[in-house]
Amino acid sequence: MCWRPLCRFLWLWSYLSYVQAVPIHKVQDDTKTLIKTIVTRINDISHTQSVSARQRVTGLDFIPGLHPILSLSKMDQTLAVYQQILTSLPSQNVLQIAHDLENLRDLLHLLAFSKSCSLPQTRGLQKPESLDGVLEASLYSTEVVALSRLQGSLQDILQQLDLSPEC
């Protein structure tokens, strides 16, 4: 009889019995830190300072605006739209921000799971119909407006996380 697999299993079992779950406040702190990091990345892109998040730009109505009260579900949906818009932009400025948004959404899913919420699957959202046409006509404006509104939305999400948002 071969004892090696049994020994490996027992060694792994002893290790797993000491592993503890990450406290939810740690996940919430990581979420806030990532939001602040994304906001800093947006601030580092100099041309985003020229447009207000509240400014209306014709043809860019599909970019989410500010929402005063956000549930975890609404936060995730909003970030999914921004992620989709940013990944459609050819600019290298927004590539890391798009990846950060995916990580932020994963953290929001962990927060929702800790509250026994199940967030709807938003990974396969369809691209807004007008996005391709707008990108072709005004790539620069789309990037500036999207980043400006994303920054405002992230500030709202940061405030809502302190209020322990609902599902």
Swiss-Prot record:
Gene3D superfamilies: 1.20.1250.10
S-S bridge residues: 117-167
SUPFAM superfamilies with a match to the protein in the record: 4-helical cytokines (SSF47266)
Record has Mitochondrion as a keyword: no
PANTHER family reported in the protein's UniProt record: LEPTIN (PTHR11724:SF1)
Family to which this protein belongs: Belongs to the leptin family.
Protein name according to UniProt: Leptin
Source organism per UniProt: Rattus norvegicus
Name of encoding gene: Lep
